[in-house]
Amino acid sequence: MGLTKKKVLVGMSGGVDSSVAAYLLKEQGYEVIGATMQIWQEDKEVEEREGGCCSLSAVEDARRVCDKLDIPFYVLNFRDSFKKKVIEPFIQEYIDGRTPNPCIECNKHLKFDELLRKAQGIGVDYIATGHYAKIDKKDDRYMLIRSDDDRKDQTYALYNFTQDQLAHTLMPCGEYTKDRIREIAKEIGLAVHNKKDSEEICFISDNDHGKYILNAKPGAVKSGNFVDKSGNILGKHKGIVYYTIGQRKGLGLSVGRPVFVTDINPKTNEVVIGAEEDIFKTELIAGDLNFITFDKLEKEIEVEAKIRYSARPGKATIVPLKDGRVKVVFNEKQRAITKGQSVVFYNGNIVIGGGVIEAII
């Protein structure tokens, strides 16, 4: 009597990474099931023009891949959860003068929480995705580790993993470079082998988040003043949701020198403008923390910290505060630390944890 194969549900976006992840896991001997999370419904005209990563065309791409791999495929309805846990907080964060990262919230609440629970509810052992990251076990603790392809590493968006979630998650693409993943897809005859990577926010097909928020909550977007750090009025802005810390383009100001957004004040509806040197800071406060390598930060430790997806990690010290948050002190000034973005802590290639930036000091 043979051993029963372990079952894995692969979250499939219709892209090359999750498609090859499904193939690799089947080759490794798992019983693979493909599933696409239906999270947003574009109107037909936009759908046909844009074809984003959660669109109907993406669902069809995923279905065709599963047919090719001879594995079952399902579409799971996550629309209500996505709206409540990703879209509505995304809109509110911008209205509150912060710059959110919806991918992190989607990973935290949907992919590695609700999807995992749904999978376990039907007797599936693991979930898997096409993320570029690795999971390993050291002693009695699961670790999240940077991908072998440094350019494509996605651990910044994955720091909210719990130990139980890591124990039931597989990420086979983390062992490969992106180029090799595309080669594998071509070798096995997948039509998505040359499909371009999705770079926009998946539920905003034209990548214009300001217009999206204006349409969703028109009364919440109001014109206000651009001011300098002394409070002098420099001009009019079209609504704080259109701006982020460090922004230079699209301000519509003519003051005779390059100027940048240095702060956003939702209480006064003002956007503060200054010189580039004003957006370089060394300290921040972060909350909504999650740690992977240990349960709780008991004392200050030295780390490498990353303040946005595209940033290089900088050496820093994280200090626990009495209110449960942490202070992060960088050795060198960081450009455009932004409230609402996450700060993620590393020890070499190992993800220590992270949190959401709440204040810049």
UniProtKB/Swiss-Prot annotation:
Origin: domain of life: Bacteria
Residues reported in the UniProt entry to bind ATP: G11, M12, S13, G14, G15, V16, D17, S18, M37, G130
Active-site feature positions: C106 (nucleophile), C202 (cysteine persulfide intermediate)
Keywords for the protein's UniProt record, in alphabetical order: ATP-binding, Cytoplasm, Disulfide bond, Nucleotide-binding, RNA-binding, Transferase, tRNA processing, tRNA-binding
InterPro entries, sorted: MnmA-like, MnmA-like_C, MnmA-like_central, MnmA-like_central_sf, Rossmann-like_a/b/a_fold
Site residues by UniProt (Interaction with tRNA): H131, Q341
Entry keyword annotation includes RNA-binding: yes
Pfam families linked: tRNA_Me_trans, tRNA_Me_trans_C, tRNA_Me_trans_M
Keyword Nucleotide-binding: yes
Gene3D superfamilies the record matches: Adenine nucleotide alpha hydrolases-like domains (2.30.30.280), HUPs (3.40.50.620), Translation factors (2.40.30.10)
GO CC field: cytoplasm
Stretches for region Interaction with tRNA: 152-154, 308-309
Entry's localization field: Cytoplasm
E.C. designation(s): 2.8.1.13
Main location: cytoplasm
Family matches, as PANTHER family: MITOCHONDRIAL TRNA-SPECIFIC 2-THIOURIDYLASE 1, TRNA 5-METHYLAMINOMETHYL-2-THIOURIDYLATE -METHYLTRANSFERASE
Function as written in the Swiss-Prot or TrEMBL entry: Catalyzes the 2-thiolation of uridine at the wobble position (U34) of tRNA, leading to the formation of s(2)U34.
Protein name as it appears in the record: tRNA-specific 2-thiouridylase MnmA
Species whose genome carries this gene: Clostridium botulinum (strain Eklund 17B / Type B)
Gene behind this protein: mnmA
